[in-house]
Amino acid sequence: IGLSFVNAADLNMMIASGVIGLIIGMLFCKNKDMYWERILVGLGDKMAMTAVLIWLIVGIYGTILRKGQLVEGLVWLSVRLHLSGSAFCAAAFLFSAAFALATGAAFGTVAAMTPILYPVGVIMGCNPAVLGGAIISGALFGDNIAPVSDTTIVSSTGQLYSKRSGSAEIGGTVRDRVKYVIPAFISSIILYFIFGGTSGSLRIGAAVAETLVASHQNPAGLLMMIPTIIVIGMAVKGHNLFVTLPVGIIVATGVGLIAGLFGFNDLFSIQNGIVSGALPTGVAGMLNVCILLMVVVSMGDLLISSGYMEELVEKLSKNIKITRQAEFLIFLFSTAFSVLISAINTIPNICASPLVNALGQKAKLHPYRRANFLAVACDSFNACMPFGGSVLLLLGCIKTLSADAAYIAVPAPSDFLATCFYPCILWVVMFVAILT
């Protein structure tokens, strides 16, 4: 939490802080051997290991899609549809959402989409702050609804059934969440279309704009939507993610190679002892997040095994008389976690999950409903916080772009408080659902 508030969303430091926290915790424990044994149990937690393996596969899958120029294909489509200004801003939201829906990676979407959509959007007359908000919102849409996203996986697998073994099924949770997502999704498109245009004049000439747009187009990139559609369809129908994702990788590789979008060397190559390509790059991009997940899960397991969570649930649930009160408590508690821990939206999801599960079971809430409260709350206001990981990543990409292109405007971190429409609207939709 402290690192988030000082804009130090560095994964290595967060991992180090977690390890230091575990060491400090040992000082307050009577049986230190048992303490570390419990930590090892937490590190090997089945939920954590399931997420780790899926994330590694997702890392490879998402990198292959980027190598296949999916982004360039989407930009080509927007140009052919004559999208500019507000229309392009709405399209940026849709394209970002499509990419995030395919990969399930919010940060990966921001990192992949910003270098392409942001400069082109500025050229076409988009309001820079609103355009950035559209990219983040699209990323959050995919992270919230994609069957392969870490948010969907963690929020579902952490909510257990009361009367039988197992956790909330991912496919069922996604289907149940759609009725909340659709109103927020449509409202966001309308708002980005209304507020996406800029009143200022463009600072570049038409020739430069035409050259820049032309250099980031490839209609063949749209072919990479084929594996995307297959993965989403299989996952929603209930197929195991360990089956759907490898199928997506195989299809994406085949499509990319046949269409000439990339070669075998783009997937894996060794030059002068240096390994490169989509396969090692995809795994490397997920390693730190996976390690951080394991550390945080082990810390959460300590809270549960110590009896602290049971005592906290007992105190919080004493005055709960009706189901709606439990739903409000779960939703607001998860929201508070998302704001306090904004560096990575998966972390508040993991931290709040045990308490949400305990309170929800006591109030006899279905695991699907609990998972949706958790996923929506943890993918809400943290997206637009000035110290949040999404905003910091977006600004980092924009600043890198602006160093070589004077026409690219760099918004202030606080500008996104009012432009990340989708996650905020979705939070309101869920809040209203609790009321009704």
Segments from the language model and where they lie:
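Juxtamembrane helix-boundary/capping and inter-helix hinge elements in multi-pass membrane proteins
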Residues: 30-33, 44-48, 125-129, 154-174, ...
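Membrane-interfacial loop-to-helix junctions in multi-pass transporters
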Residues: 45-51, 76-94, 122-131, 217-223, ...
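Hydrophobic alpha-helical transmembrane segments of multi-pass integral membrane proteins
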Residues: 52-61, 83-116, 316-357, 362-363, ...
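Alpha-helical transmembrane segments of multi-pass membrane proteins
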Residues: 86-99, 125-142, 325-338, 365-384, ...
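Interfacial loop-to-helix junctions that mark the boundaries of transmembrane helices
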Residues: 4-16, 41-45, 79-84, 175-176, ...
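Hydrophobic mid-bilayer segments of alpha-helices in multi-pass membrane transport proteins
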Residues: 1, 9-29, 51-58, 90, ...
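Juxtamembrane and boundary regions of transmembrane helices in multi-pass small-molecule transporters
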Residues: 137-139, 144-213, 383-436
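Core transmembrane alpha-helical segments of multi-pass membrane transporters/permeases
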Residues: 11-19, 27, 35-72, 270-310, ...
